[in-house]
Structure formats: structure tokens, C-alpha cells
Amino acid sequence: MISRSALSRGSQLALRRPAAAKTAQRGFAAAAASPAASYEPTTIAGVKVASRDDSGPTTRLAVVAKAGTRYEPLPGLTVGLEEFAFKNTNKRTALRITRESELLGGQLQAYHTREAVVLQASFLREDLPYFTELLAEVISETKYTTHEFHELVENCIHEKQAKLDSAAIALDAAHNVAFHSGLGSPLYPTVDTPTSSYLNENSVAAFANLAYNKANIAVVADGASQAGLEKWVEPFFKGVPATSSGNLNTAASKYFGGEQRVAKNGKNAIVIAFPGASLGVPHPETSVLVGLLGGVSNIKWSPGFSLLAKATAANPGAEAFAHNYAYSDAGLLAIQITGKGAAVGKVAVEAVKGLKAIAAGGVSKEDLTKAIAKAKFNLLSASEVSGTGLVHAGANLLAGGKPIQVAETLKALEGVTAEKLQAAAKKLLEGKASVSAVGDLHVLPYAEDLGLKV
């Protein structure tokens, strides 16, 4: 291992940074002059890799594994795999991993989506060797011990189950009626799911063997050169198995549509969803439609131009926003509304009215221009702010595609016209919607009340 030398570099934090500051200044100038660079894909020692380098002082490195809830053979295995990340390995204890990362100023996190488990490290760019080694070690040499499962992993899962609110339950329900199994599986198992029948350290270890192999992972770096990755990925990931003896369930997604209603105390939530844009398939109209539907205003003291922002301003007590959930072979364009029951119902009615107005050609030139600009901002800021770009780049590689090409996508957004947007909205309304309501069902409307087909 090279951790000792990496740590000796990490202990000199106070003496390092004049060169890095100059590098950062050059990076900021470059960012102002041109759009964010796209991730460049390659294969290193059998591992799919994507990287982009803005010459900044920090790096984000992630292992994206095709092990999200869509692929778990039993409920709870994905979150179990996530919670075992950065625990004891054959070479290091969890305490040592934590202390070494802190000495280097690094940040470690593990999370999952419906399609992926993501192990991510953020650090100073000269510490790439240490964190590349660490991520390879975590996926190939983690100990799935009984005491850690019962004392740490199981408790974390129960805490996350207890935190599930109406908005999360409604979004899961919308996915369930839209896709049934696969993408329809909940992001976290509910409190009523009998996970004890399926979830233990042995089942998580078996799932790890299916998930963590070269055919099923992608390594994605933001802020690292491809040459640097080639230098360190090859020696450190050589111990990762090439394939697995078993197979994940990779059946193609199919959209169904439908309605689900769940009675629950507390805040109310409605999700109105339609087939959306998938990863790697250009559909700029969906991105512009999301910008036009909008949600929370970006301008203080103004409701903003978006349809949902205006609807919530007229109905205090509710919040709403639109988002396209993009997956490898499907997408879900969702309007999510939460708040007091009566206000949520009224905003839902206004949201559908707004969508029908778009389908009827009622979009002004000014609003279209604003929506396109908002779609551009969402695209360029996603990877910088939330790390979405890392996950999407990895997911595209695992699906056999290539990471999104920023320049091409920006050009496609500029080509969206009012007629194209009208046609896209009309197609959504002509098909089956996926509608979920959680909360006071006496107040929350049915899909039929909203004028939607399910």
C-alpha cells in the first residue's frame, strides 16, 4: 500500500498551496470562457473509466456500480451494500480509513440511486493515488462482519426508514405504478417491508460479489487527468474480479402508468408523472419543459416565470417543482407537490392546466427563452453542484453508451421551438400518467379529477 507516503504529503497542508492557487485562477478563467468539459471515456485494465480535468486544485473520484435498487434481488440489499462502504477491510480498519482521510483533508461518502451504488471521495488532486487505492480496496476487500451489520448497518437502515416522509413515499409510489418492478422498487425499504427475512451480512456479501466486478463498475473522475488515472487505476484495480459467477436482473424497463393512494398523517404529497427522457438519448424538449414547469423561484421577492411557481404563489401552503428522473433505458418526468392538503390539491389542478396550456400552444416567446436558459443552467450546474454528472457518466458507461456531450446538448437545447415543446406536452397528455397521492385522501384529488388518463 502507498498510504504512508500519501499521508506524509497530507501532513504538509500548511506548506503546499501557492502553485495550487495559481492553477485554480487559470481554471476559473477557463470556466468563464467556455462550457464545462465533457467526460472522456476509456478502458483501463478492463475497467470502464471516464474523466475530465479542469486543472483545479481538487478532485472527485467515484466508483459507480450497477447495484441500485433496480437490480437488487432482495429488498434492502442495495442500502445494506451502501452502509458497509468504508467499514473494515482486509487491510484497514474503519477507524484507520477515517483518520487517514481526515489527515489528507478528504471527504468520503456512499449513496445509491435506483440504478447505482456510488462510492465517492473528494480530495486535493495530488492525493489521487491514495484515494484510488482506497476505493479499489473497499469494493474488493471489505469484510461483511456480523457485528458491524447488527451494530451499525442495521441501525442506519432503520434510521433512514424512519425518516421517509410523504414526498419520498409519493415518489416511490409513482415509480412503482410507472414501472412496477425494477425501477419501480422503492429507493429505501419502507418500515413495513420484512427486511429481516432477506437482509443479513451474508446476503449483502453475496450481492457485493455480484455487483463489484470489472464488468459491472465504472470509475469516474472530475478534476483528474486521464494519464493520472491510467497510472493508478491499473495497479490498484487489478485485484477486482473481472466478472461474477452470478447475474443481476437486467430486464428492460417497461412503462405502465396508473394510480396509487396512501393514507398517512402529516404533510400531504402528490406526484404527477409521465414517461421522461432517458440517459444518453437526446430529448431537449423534456429539459426545456422541466424549465418551463419549474418550481421554486430563483429570484427573491418574485414568484418567477415558471408555471408551478405561479401556482404555489397563488396557493400558500404548498411547494412544487418538476424534475426529469433519467435512467439508462427509461425516464420519468415528475411534478412533485407537497404541503397542506387543500393547497396541494389546488396546485395539482393548476399544474395539469398549465401542461394542457403548453399542449395547446400557449407558450410565449419570452417564456420559451427563459425556459431554455434555465435548462442550460440546470445542465451545466448539475455536475458542479450536486455531483449528478459523475453518476450519469458512470451509468452511461455501464449501459454501453458514452457520457453526455455538453456542447452538443447545449446546441440541441437552443434548437427547441414552441412547436416542438407543444408536441412534447401533447404526447404526454395523450398517454397514461402515473399519479400518486400520500396524506389526507379525503382532500387529495384522484387522477380523474385532474383530467388525466391512468
From Swiss-Prot:
Q: What is its main location?
A: mitochondrion
| GO terms, molecular function | metal ion binding
Report the Pfam families cross-referenced here.
Peptidase_M16, Peptidase_M16_C
Membrane-related topology note: Peripheral membrane protein
Which portion of the chain is the transit peptide?
A: 1-35
One GO CC term, this protein: mitochondrion
Where it sits in the cell: the answer is: Mitochondrion inner membrane
In terms of InterPro entries, this protein maps to: Metalloenz_LuxS/M16, MPP/UQCRC_Complex, Pept_M16_N, Peptidase_M16_C
Instruction: Explain the consequences of disrupting this gene.
Output: Mutants display reduced growth, are female sterile and lack active complex III.
Q: Which UniProt keywords apply?
A: Electron transport, Membrane, Mitochondrion, Mitochondrion inner membrane, Respiratory chain, Transit peptide, Transport
Its function? Answer: Component of the ubiquinol-cytochrome c oxidoreductase, a multisubunit transmembrane complex that is part of the mitochondrial electron transport chain which drives oxidative phosphorylation.
According to the record's subunit comment, the protein's assembly and interactions are:
Component of the ubiquinol-cytochrome c oxidoreductase (cytochrome b-c1 complex, complex III, CIII), a multisubunit enzyme composed of 10 subunits. The complex is composed of 3 respiratory subunits cytochrome b (cob), cytochrome c1 (cyt-1) and Rieske protein (fes-1), 2 core protein subunits pep and ucr-1, and 5 low-molecular weight protein subunits qcr6, qcr7, qcr8, qcr9 and probably NCU16844/qcr10.
Give the protein family. Answer: Belongs to the peptidase M16 family. UQCRC2/QCR2 subfamily.
Name of the protein this chain belongs to = Cytochrome b-c1 complex subunit 2, mitochondrial
Q: Which organism is it from?
A: Neurospora crassa (strain ATCC 24698 / 74-OR23-1A / CBS 708.71 / DSM 1257 / FGSC 987)
| Gene designation per UniProt | ucr-1
